[in-house]
Regions:
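AAA+ P-loop NTPase catalytic core and its hallmark functional loops
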Residues: 2-193
Length: 193
């Protein structure tokens, strides 16, 4: 499990409430920054707020700002994805979202596909994930990690390992590798129970 040790683990988010609340989080005393975090539901419903303790929320934000990998675990429907999306939006950094639970072909989603047409012949088209890991200071949300195809774990192993941080485009010796850019943070969600 690459989301352990030095990385932040925040679990058991309570259910969401149907009211709008703005949470103010003081980042670091030396930065003297106050940040407002609010989640606006993409379905046009009444804004919702995550009922997370202020201490857990501060820890989560500070961990993300410091570039630590974060894994949020809890039962289905408790607000992990919404909390992760709120963190991503609040950081105001380039962001990418990948629903690994809905991915049937992890190689296509995380690496890319080989295509053929009469004009160009055979060519390789990189996946958006390749662009994401090459984007400095990006925040990459890996949703539903616990439901991911087993091949996704093999592909992500070197990407998430602090000592490696690269993506191999092919299994063959000498195949190209893509280094993860500086400052890239991964936030993952996984169901338990």
């Amino acid at each position: 499990d690459k989301f352990s040790g030095k990385d932040a683990i925040v679990d058991d988010f309570p259910l969401l409430e149907q009211t709008q609340i703005i949470v103010k989080v003081e980042v670091d005393a030396d930065q003297a920054v106050m940040m407002n975090f609010i989640h606006n539901d993409s379905y046009g419903l009444k804004p919702k707020h995550l009922m997370v303790s202020e201490l857990k929320w501060k820890y989560l934000i500070r961990s993300a700002m410091r570039g630590k990998n974060i894994m949020m675990t809890g039962p289905a429907g408790c607000g992990k994805t919404m909390a992760a999306k709120s963190v991503v939006a609040a950081l105001e950094r380039p962001d990418y979202y990948f629903n690994l639970g809905a991915t049937q072909d992890p190689r296509a989603t995380l690496i890319g596909n080989t295509h053929f047409n009469k004009e160009d012949g055979t060519y390789f088209s990189e996946a958006l994930f390749v662009k994401a890991i090459q984007t400095p200071n990006a925040v990459i949300l890996l949703d539903e990690l616990s439901r991911a195809h087993p091949d996704a774990a093999n592909i992500l192993m070197t990407v998430l390992d602090e000592g490696q941080r690269y993506l191999r485009l092919d299994e063959a010796d000498g195949s190209p590798t893509i280094k993860v850019a500086e400052g890239v943070t991964f936030i993952a969600t996984a169901n338990i129970g």
